[in-house]
């Protein structure tokens, strides 16, 4: 499970696009239709698009014109985690596509994932360093569960001509986006997940207030909560995510694993390949063939281990 803060882009004037209305983002997230494809909140299962925009855009008291008014978060389970969630909800094992489920089963899976997102928004609130304990009830937010992902120009498959931009990605693609207001529901507390200065104190409306947000705390807690809530046992590579405090160390472990598996795989191919021509291709491959081989091998290793980065 990877929880992500999508950092705001800047416009041509260098001002964050999140300093304005959320209308473009809300309409973008409204793109999918079907079972369970509604905005939801802490206490509502279905919220109209117009209400989402109106409430987020009007919850900005004390914020300056150039300050972010909202943020987008996403909760992204691995395909292995999604399959586990489906089994917990429906009893069906080894599901590789939502199309194999009935409409009622899909509705149950989406509803359960919505509840998990609600839990994660509680976790998000708790990881702000404030004078009082916060919960999702203190936040103004709206979520949207999606079941599809599309290939973009950034994907290697598109760059290599194997897929076209806009093609649907295969497999289980369940995930959720959240629009969360920077201000709390009382419009007296500013909550920026970009603030890293845990423990600092600023003055807001004449009062001293603590600030800061623990990004790592939020991500790790959400990751662990999935396991606790659904009895999910993470594999070894997923456990690196919250046991290893050094990203460089984690990165090196993955790089070494990839190199080791690629070399072992090539040794096996040398043993089984016969004929002078095939041996020559392995010992003296073209740059293009090596590039394609390594890309596919690395992708397979990452998919097999369900990495959370």
Task: Describe the function of each predicted region.
Residues 1-309:
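N-terminal nicking endonuclease/strand-transfer module with a His-rich metal-binding environment
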């Amino acid at each position: 499970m990877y929880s992500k803060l999508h950092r705001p882009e800047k416009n041509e004037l260098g001002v964050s696009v999140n300093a304005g209305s959320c209308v473009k983002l809300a309409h973008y997230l409204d793109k999918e239709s079907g079972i369970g494809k509604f905005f939801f909140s802490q206490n509502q299962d279905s919220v109209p698009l117009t209400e989402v925009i109106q409430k987020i855009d009007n919850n900005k008291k004390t914020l300056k014109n150039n300050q972010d008014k909202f943020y987008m978060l996403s909760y992204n389970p691995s395909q292995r985690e999604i399959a586990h969630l489906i089994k917990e909800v429906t009893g069906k094992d080894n599901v590789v596509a939502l199309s194999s489920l009935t409409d009622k089963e899909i509705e149950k899976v989406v509803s359960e994932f919505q509840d998990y997102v609600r839990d994660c928004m509680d976790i998000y609130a708790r990881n702000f360093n404030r004078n009082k304990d916060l919960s999702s009830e203190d936040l103004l937010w709206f979520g949207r569960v999606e079941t599809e992902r599309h290939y973009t120009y950034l994907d290697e498959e598109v760059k290599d001509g194997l897929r076209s931009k806009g093609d649907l990605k295969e497999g289980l693609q369940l995930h959720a986006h959240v629009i969360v207001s920077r201000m709390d529901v009382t419009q007296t507390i500013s909550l920026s997940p970009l603030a890293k200065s845990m423990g600092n104190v600023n003055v807001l409306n004449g009062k001293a207030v603590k600030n800061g947000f623990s990004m790592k705390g939020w991500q790790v807690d959400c990751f662990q909560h999935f396991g606790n809530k659904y009895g999910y046992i993470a594999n070894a590579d997923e456990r690196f995510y919250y046991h290893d405090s050094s990203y460089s160390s984690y990165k090196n472990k993955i790089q070494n694993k990839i190199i080791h598996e690629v070399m072992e795989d090539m040794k096996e191919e040398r043993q089984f390949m016969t004929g002078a021509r095939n041996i020559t291709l392995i010992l003296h491959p073209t740059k293009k063939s090596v590039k394609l081989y390594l890309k596919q091998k690395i992708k397979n290793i990452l998919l097999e281990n369900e990495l959370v980065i």
